[in-house]
Amino acid sequence: MARPGLTIALLLTTPNLVDACQQWLPDTRYHSIVLSGPHQGQEQLDLVSTLEAQQEEIDAVVVEQQLLDASSRDQLLGRGLLFPAVVVGEMKGHVDYHAEELHLAEDQLAQLGYTVDAAISRFLRQGRADGRSDDDGLASVDKLSRRLQERLGYLGVFYKRDPSRFLGSLPTEERRELLESLQRTYRDLLISYFSDPAASNQALESFVNTAFFSDLPITRTVDIHVDQIDEFWKQLRLEGNKSEFLQDYRLALLDVMAHLCEMYRRSIPPDIPLSGLASGRHRREADLPDAPEVSS
């Protein structure tokens, strides 16, 4: 039986951005609804009233960073209007909406579907970890978490990836665009790795989440790192600058690998006995469970 599509609310300011996001949300898995934009006849979107009116229908949100000012954020948190969220905008290293949000730059939207899955996984896992309850004033969050778990199944996106969306299963052009998007994310990660660790961590999360959910081969991850360092080396050489420090960026690759290893480790449900793992040893890799994202 096919899973029901997840309803993703798009809170964006321009038709071009809406079109770009819809392009990368497969309609076989997601149903996107546009809750903002000039065509809505609104000069300024009221995030609180908009989300409150659609609260029962929304499973996750894709929201533009500039819409999340301090006042809107405080009102959303105060009313318990929390959803799995992907914030589209710059990697600034700070929280725009809530602690479980994920970030994606506008030039990296080819990763959007994978990032939405990761955001839902993170939201559900954190709900279990922090023991949310009605006493916390977050009854609506509990209700959403239960609804997502019911619709996705007990394991949901915690432990099941979609093999049809693995890198090797994508059409050639889509695969190329996804790889180019990942390269841009990795570049952002490296550029801010030593100068702005918080922003770099957001880029790292974005890269690792997509790498995991798209089943990016480890060798391809290494290739992306080597290619990017090579580009930096060529640029430094043209400018007549020293390049010895580039070897320090091996730490970034080790960081990425450590996060990926942790995700695979967490992909094994804690209540599955070792005998169960042994009996499934010969399953195809596409059927292996997966995990929520990890942040440093």
Swiss-Prot record:
GO terms for biological process: circadian rhythm. Residues 2-152 form the KaiA N-terminal domain. The keyword Coiled coil does not apply. Pfam families: KaiA, KaiA_N. Residues 162-270 form the KaiA C-terminal domain. InterPro entries: CheY-like_superfamily (IPR011006), Circadian_clock_KaiA (IPR011648), Circadian_clock_KaiA_N (IPR020844), Circadian_clock_protein_KaiA_C (IPR020856), KaiA/RbsU_helical_domain_sf (IPR017944). Gene3D superfamilies: 3.40.50.2300, KaiA/RbsU domain. Disulfide bonds: none annotated. Residues 2-133 are annotated as: PsR domain, binds oxidized quinones. Coiled coil: none annotated. Keywords: Biological rhythms. Residues 153-161 are annotated as: Flexible linker. Key component of the KaiABC oscillator complex, which constitutes the main circadian regulator in cyanobacteria. Complex composition changes during the circadian cycle to control KaiC phosphorylation. KaiA stimulates KaiC autophosphorylation, while KaiB sequesters KaiA, leading to KaiC autodephosphorylation. KaiA binding to the KaiC CII domain during the subjective day yields KaiA(2-4):KaiC(6) complexes which stimulate KaiC autophosphorylation. Binds oxidized quinones via the N-terminal PsR domain, allowing it to sense redox changes and possibly mediate clock input. Homodimer. The KaiABC complex composition changes during the circadian cycle to control KaiC phosphorylation. Complexes KaiC(6), KaiA(2-4):KaiC(6), KaiB(6):KaiC(6) and KaiC(6):KaiB(6):KaiA(12) are among the most important forms, many form cooperatively. KaiA and CikA bind to the same region of the KaiB(fs) form and therefore compete. The N-terminal pseudoreceiver domain (PsR, approximately equal to KaiA N-terminal) binds oxidized quinones. The KaiA C-terminal domain mediates interaction with KaiC, homodimerization, and is responsible for the clock oscillation function. This is Circadian clock oscillator protein KaiA. The lineage of its organism: Bacteria, Bacillati, Cyanobacteriota, Cyanophyceae, Synechococcales. The gene is kaiA.
